[in-house]
From Swiss-Prot:
InterPro entries: 3-IsopropMal_deHydase_lsu, Acnase/IPM_dHydase_lsu_aba_1/3, Acoase/IPM_deHydtase_lsu_aba, Aconitase_4Fe-4S_BS, Aconitase_4Fe-4S_dom, IPM_dehydratase_rel_enz, IPMI_cat. It catalyses: (2R,3S)-3-isopropylmalate = (2S)-2-isopropylmalate. This is 3-isopropylmalate dehydratase large subunit. Keywords: 4Fe-4S, Amino-acid biosynthesis, Branched-chain amino acid biosynthesis, Iron, Iron-sulfur, Leucine biosynthesis, Lyase, Metal-binding. The keyword S-adenosyl-L-methionine does not apply. It comes from Bacillus velezensis (strain DSM 23117 / BGSC 10A6 / LMG 26770 / FZB42) (Bacillus amyloliquefaciens subsp. plantarum).
Length: 472
């Protein structure tokens, strides 16, 4: 057999039916659902008289619409109906649900891994763009639309076009203060938001190998922002250690057998990718987005680009539009940009590693008077663990708000929105126009960079913090 990439191996193992020049029918190992993209799918099953094909392979939680202050006080009628519908649908169709009373509730892409539902080698889908998060475990995970949600519920399969393979290799050693978020933002900034179109990415190299699972999830989460269908990292000892003793993971001898198979799941020597990119991690800086997509990003010590420095006419027009919407000017220093809001959370950066990183920045300091800062743990489990470690006290004493788990300010589908014309340093994954609220201005950053912005009221190079610590 020809040498194959891990992407091809997982794909081939799950093909139920294929035909020359046609999409493949893939078996889906895990289907994650939430309250926003599932109601129409369940209604479709009901109208057709169908059942959920594999309820044991389906897991639901509530995350997008729910409040993070008083989680039971859902004021928006549409949101309330969606939450109620999910409860009713899961009960009727026999699907496991982590509802608002459950200790397992949280953002779907946070709870899937922490419960041991996400495992290496699986095919995983969810009606959400950032399903690629689960690729951190060496799984093939991608977002699907509502009609596809119904198809998977009723058949446990999905028609998909075989993707091309893209290797992104990052070697070297990251500078102190440079994080997984900076790595993926740097990649997107260098190659654009469309370069991954038609590909599934495998992230390789020592930078990714040295990352924790939380950090790997941050990287894979933003694969979609590069235009890719999915992104993954081959499983290793770090992966296996994370999966051990998780609620739904195999136990005992079954786990040891599975772990041996997972460690063998990797790209063969001599396998050829359709395209490869190699980067030096030591050259990556803390990053800040300045425009209206994740590709409009620069090192924190840079200046907003002037139109004449942009090669394409379309790029110039996009930049001019971004200046206006974001309320910024060409040649303005990133570090001179002031913020009114800071959001630490989302499926990109709301795990323990992220919260510890932010808490390290703010310990003994105070949020600037001009800033409103909130921390939203990615799950009830993360919230509990953070409180056991005392992180919540660090945030509260600094002047942050400490919330319940949910998607929160990542998107304007709940009570947490950025007011029109105001600016937010956010650890989320999208800075599109209106993403955090009508007229909201979003700058994507790492948790450490967000924490520093909260303290100073403007962007600050987090590397200075570590330099000061070294001097002291």
């Amino acid at each position: 057999m020809m040498p194959r990439t891990i992407i091809e191996k997982i794909w081939d193992r799950h093909v139920v039916k294929s035909g020359e020049g046609k999409p493949d029918l893939l078996y889906i190992d895990l289907h994650l659902i939430h309250e926003v993209t599932s109601p129409q799918a369940f209604e479709g099953l009901r109208q057709k008289g169908r059942k959920v094909r594999r309820p044991q392979n389906t897991f639901a939680t509530m995350d997008h619409n729910i409040p993070t202050v008083n989680r039971f006080d859902i004021k928006d009628e549409v949101a309330k109906r969606q939450v109620t519908a999910l409860e009713r649908n899961c009960e009727e169709f026999g699907v496991r649900l982590a509802d608002l009373h459950s200790a397992d509730q949280g953002i779907v892409h946070v709870v899937g891994p922490e419960l041991g539902l996400t495992l290496p080698g699986k095919t995983i889908v969810c009606g959400d763009s950032h399903t690629s998060t689960h690729g951190a475990f060496g799984a093939l995970a991608f977002g699907i639309g509502t009609s596809e949600v119904e198809h998977v519920l009723s058949t446990q399969t999905l028609w998909q076009q075989r993707p091309k393979t893209l290797e992104i290799r990052v070697d070297g050693t990251l500078q102190k203060g440079v994080t997984a978020k900076d790595v993926i933002l740097s990649v997107i900034g260098k190659y654009g938001v469309k370069f991954g179109t038609g590909y599934v990415i495998e992230y390789t190299g020592e930078v990714f190998r040295n990352m924790s699972m939380d950090e790997r999830m941050t990287v894979c989460n933003m694969s979609i922002e590069a235009g890719a269908r999915a992104g993954l990292i081959a499983p290793d000892d770090t992966t296996i250690e994370y999966c051990k003793n998780r609620k739904y993971a195999p136990k005992g001898e079954e786990f040891e057998k599975a772990a041996a198979e997972w460690k063998a799941l990797k790209t063969d020597p001599g396998a050829v990718y359709d395209h490869s990119i190699v980067l030096d991690g030591s050259e990556i800086s803390p990053m800040v987005t300045w425009g209206v997509n994740p590709g409009m990003v620069l090192p924190v010590d840079a200046q907003i680009p002037a139109p004449e420095t942009i090669d394409s006419e379309d790029g110039k027009k996009e930049a001019i539009r971004a200046y206006e919407y974001m309320g910024i000017s060409p040649n303005q220093k990133i570090e001179d940009i002031k913020v009114e809001h800071v959001f630490i959370g989302s499926c990109t950066n709301s795990r323990m590693t992220d919260l510890r990183q932010a808490a390290d920045m703010i310990k003994g300091r105070k949020v600037a008077d001009s800033v409103r800062a909130i921390v939203v743990p990615g799950s009830q489990s993360v919230k509990q663990q953070a409180e056991e470690e005392g992180l919540h006290r660090v945030f509260l004493e600094a002047g942050f708000e400490w919330r319940e788990s949910g998607c929160s300010m990542c998107l304007s589908m709940n009570n947490d929105v950025v007011p029109e014309g105001e600016r937010c340093a956010s650890t989320s994954n999208r800075n599109f126009e209106g993403r955090q609220g009508k007229g909201a201005r979003t700058h994507l950053v790492s948790p450490a960079m967000a924490a520093m912005a909260a303290i100073h009221g403007h962007f600050v190079d987090v590397r200075k913090f570590y330099q000061e610590k070294t001097v002291v």
